[in-house]
């Protein structure tokens, strides 16, 4: 249950869709020789799945050499639940991630028969030297002293590592400035393309992300998503010739049923809560005891949420969570001050406090709305009471 709750809150952001385990630990079987002329190297892309951990897809580099009896699919983004202090390191952004490899048959079976996700492969057109550059880089990363790295959702994940390895072997393969369809959107925009708008996970992930996620991603940077890397590879050319074969469909997953509108999603629930708060504010305007209890609940819960977001922004190594305007909208200081509200309602300092918080709330609300509009709904329930208290204090 603890694992489920942690993944529900933060899993989409930290895991993306990137594989959280290895089917086998083959890192001891490292072959540092040269590939033969019959070897082939492919990028294999696994489509997004229905589960949270699979929301953004996955990608591996597949190296096969029948003469050397090599069949390895290299995957970045592997981690071990048995790591000491796993949950704390996971939350702090200090959990070590690593590279692993499996046979392609194992991967195809798992992703097709267990997770029911489509699979496509693109064979790269490489000369022998380029093949060995890629292969040696992967094998070097498997060494114990090299295999672990610090994962970053947007900048260092299973897809960006493969992009960098390919670029190192063939520097001019990608003409990034020509890929207009892969540029112009922010990291957050690309992420939200893969998520349902009316979803608690989507809302939570957007609340957790800070200003860095709104930076416009270049075509190269957009390849933090495996689908975008596959698309870039399809457009890549070397000396006027296609750098990779067109995607070969290895497995076509059955078309999933389109999910209907979720009546318990955040858009509906938060709108109902906003309406309820407005109704109670009017209906019980002459019942200070009831309103005080409602304020304690709203300001306390929203204040705790604000402290959690503030911790993610300032107390972790997740750079994409820094400078988060949601902290202004939800305002952490509400939690320690919540029990003071009613008793200070006649004091001048109370009026000044409410005025300052109202301004900060509006700044955070407008800012958050521009980033992802459902976030505004998350701030309004307590915001309505904030302005009601400010009017009462006038």
Regions found by a protein language model. Give the residues of each.
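A structural motif
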Residues: 126-139
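Activation targets extended, charge/polar-rich intrinsically disordered C-terminal tails
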Residues: 140-339, 345-349, 357-394
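Glycine-rich catalytic cores of cysteine/serine-nucleophile enzymes that process amide/ester linkages
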Residues: 37-116
């Amino acid at each position: 249950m603890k694992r489920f709750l942690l993944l529900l809150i933060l899993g989409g952001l930290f895991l993306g869709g990137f594989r959280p385990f290895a089917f086998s630990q083959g890192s001891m079987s490292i072959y540092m020789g040269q590939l033969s002329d019959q070897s082939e190297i492919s990028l294999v892309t696994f489509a997004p799945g229905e589960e949270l951990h699979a929301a953004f897809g996955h990608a591996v580099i597949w190296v096969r050499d029948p003469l050397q009896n090599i069949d390895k699919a290299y995957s970045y983004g592997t981690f071990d639940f048995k790591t000491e202090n796993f949950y704390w390191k996971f939350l702090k952004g200090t959990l070590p991630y690593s590279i692993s490899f499996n046979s392609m048959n194992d991967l195809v079976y798992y992703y097709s028969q267990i997770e029911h996700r489509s699979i496509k492969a693109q064979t790269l057109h490489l000369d022998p030297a380029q093949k060995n550059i890629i292969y040696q880089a992967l094998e070097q990363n498997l060494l114990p002293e090299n295999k672990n790295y610090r994962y970053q959702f947007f900048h260092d994940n299973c897809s960006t590592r493969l992009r960098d390895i390919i670029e190192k072997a063939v520097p001019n393969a990608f003409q990034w400035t020509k890929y207009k369809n892969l540029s112009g959107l922010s990291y957050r925009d690309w992420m939200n393309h893969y998520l349902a708008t009316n979803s608690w996970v989507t809302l939570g992930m957007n609340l957790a992300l800070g200003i860095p996620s709104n930076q416009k991603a270049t075509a190269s940077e957009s390849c933090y998503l495996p689908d975008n890397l596959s698309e870039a590879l399809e457009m890549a050319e070397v000396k006027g010739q296609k750098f990779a074969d067109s995607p070969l469909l290895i497995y076509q997953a059955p078309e999933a049923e389109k999910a209907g509108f979720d009546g318990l999603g955040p858009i509906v629930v938060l709108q109902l809560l906003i309406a309820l708060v407005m109704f109670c504010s009017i209906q019980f305007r002459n019942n200070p005891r009831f309103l005080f209890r409602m304020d304690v609940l709203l300001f306390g819960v929203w204040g705790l949420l604000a402290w959690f977001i503030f911790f993610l922004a300032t107390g972790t190594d997740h750079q994409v969570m820094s400078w988060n305007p949601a902290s202004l909208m939800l305002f952490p200081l509400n939690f320690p001050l919540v029990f003071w509200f009613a008793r200070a309602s006649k004091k001048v300092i109370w009026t000044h406090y409410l005025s300052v918080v109202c301004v900060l709330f509006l700044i955070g609300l407008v800012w958050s709305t521009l980033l992802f509009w459902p976030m505004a709904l998350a701030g309004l329930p307590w915001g309505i009471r904030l302005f009601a208290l400010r009017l009462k204090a006038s």
